[in-house]
Structures are given as C-alpha cells and as structure tokens.
Amino acid sequence: MRVIDRKTGKEVVAGDTLIRKDYKGFRHRYEILEYLGSGMVWVKKLTQGDRWVYLSMPLASLQLDEVLI
C-alpha cells in the first residue's frame, strides 16, 4: 500500500511533514509518525501555540489517498 498526497501527487512516507489549513484558514504542520491501517494515520500536529499534539486521523482529513500496488 502506498499513500499519495492529493495536492502534489507525491508519495507520503512516515517522517514526512505536511502543512494543511483548517476551516478557519490557520495553517498547521503535521508530521506523519505511523500508518495504522484501514485509512488511519498517527500524526504529530504543531498547533498555533507552538505545542505538539499527537492524534490519530483519517487519511482523507489530511487530503491523502491509499493506493494499492
């Protein structure tokens, strides 16, 4: 299984950093830590207050797609 970024079309692997905007337009940095399977990913999110938050998120919320090879 490969995970592809919808915005750039490039493959995303554990350790990569993504920058995404939330619904209010604020930018957040997400570092991919691990793929949990079944469309979920474990991430480290840098918030506006310069704090790191660890989350499990669906791939779709980070604009990522799973591709089977």
Residue ranges, per PLM feature:
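Short beta-strand-centered aromatic/proline hotspots
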Residues: 26-35
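Intrinsically disordered, low-complexity, charged/polar segments
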Residues: 45-69
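Generic beta-strand structural signal
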Residues: 13, 35-37
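Short aromatic-glycine-enriched beta-strand elements
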Residues: 39-42
